[in-house]
A protein has these predicted regions:
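Conserved alpha/beta-hydrolase "acid-adjacent" motif
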Residues: 254-263
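Alpha/beta-hydrolase
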Residues: 180-246
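Catalytic active-site module of serine/aspartate enzymes centered on a nucleophile-bearing elbow/loop
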Residues: 274-309
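Conserved hydrolase catalytic core segment
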Residues: 124-158
Length: 309
């Protein structure tokens, strides 16, 4: 691992080269076993460096399947354990939405921390949306060898609140009763919040393939974080053991506009470790699953390869 510096670096992403040996591929992917314990046992048995993927609201662990295959191909061992009680499939999730209700940021952060503490090697941690917030919490606990937070949900101390973010969160925050519910998105809501940067056909495909209900609780926790000193939606950005961190932002993201990602970057930049940021042009909140996922995956992999072998 390279020594941490006392300053932050801002850089532009290089295009992901499909001709390089670490190119994304879904041919013969080595998909992780289903249960968290099986994934932990496999990771420890391989002796390779683990990479833990954390999804956000309205998605399942399967949203990381292609990423997991890429990281396995690059020599890491991928874990996609999911949030507590996550169903195995989108169909099951939509048939039984109540399993998502009442999940809190603290509960899910502790769930992933417990998984990581069972690993023989400190992992790299990648998270998208609320998974990005969880990744920062885990890094703040000193449990991550390197962290990538992609379109991360805001945490305490992040002040910008763009109108598009309010509109994207309105299906949940617009009804206080949703605090204790599992809330699905209609196609129109998903189109605005996730799939605004893709065409209509792809938006329909993404909604059908990936969209599931989500716990309303984390959104209310994030929305009130700056008014609640005891909020669970906060990360220890000052911990010197936080490790290198990359903040990735989609230029056209409605749910987490660049103003939020930039504020997260500034907050994390106070850490003595390396903190870097990338804004991916012309991309929305679905950037980890849409047609351009390879570029974002490549940027993330290249960052992790610099720090974790």
């Amino acid at each position: 691992m390279r020594p941490a510096s006392n300053h932050s670096i801002r850089f532009c992403p290089r295009r992901f080269d499909p001709e390089k040996g670490d190119r994304p591929t879904t041919e013969n992917p080595q998909q992780p076993p289903v249960t968290a314990d099986e994934q932990i046992d496999r990771a420890n048995a391989t002796g390779r460096t683990p990479v833990v993927f954390i999804h956000g609201l309205w998605l399942l662990p399967s949203s990381w399947d292609r990423w997991a295959a890429v990281f396995e191909h690059a020599g890491y061992v991928a874990l996609t354990p999911g949030w507590p009680d996550d169903p195995d499939t989108v169909e099951e999730a939509n048939a039984h939405p109540d399993v998502f209700a009442h999940k809190t940021v603290g509960q899910v952060a502790d769930h992933f921390s417990a998984i990581i503490e069972k690993l023989d090697k400190a992992p790299a941690v990648l998270g998208h949306s609320f998974g990005g917030l969880l990744a920062q919490i885990i890094a703040g606990r000193g449990l991550s060898a390197a962290t990538v937070a992609i379109d991360s949900a805001p945490l305490r101390g992040v002040l910008p609140l763009p109108i598009s973010a309010l509109r994207a969160a309105a299906p949940v925050l617009g009804n206080p009763a949703n605090h204790h519910r599992a809330v699905p998105l209609t196609y129109e809501q998903f189109r605005y919040a996730f799939a605004n940067a893709v065409d209509e056909d792809e938006a329909q495909q993404l909604y059908k393939e990936f969209a599931v209900p989500a716990s309303g609780t984390p959104l209310f926790q994030a929305a009130t974080a700056n008014f609640n000193p005891w909020t669970q939606a906060k990360a220890n950005s000052n911990n010197p053991d936080r490790g290198p961190m990359l903040i990735v932002s989609g230029e056209n993201d409605h749910t987490v506009p660049p103003a939020i990602s930039n504020a997260i970057f500034k907050k994390q930049s106070r850490n003595p470790g390396i903190t870097e940021t990338v804004t991916v042009p012309d991309r929305g909140h679905a950037l980890v699953v849409d047609h351009g996922w390879r570029e974002v995956c490549g940027v993330s992999l290249n960052f992790i390869k610099r720090w974790v072998q």
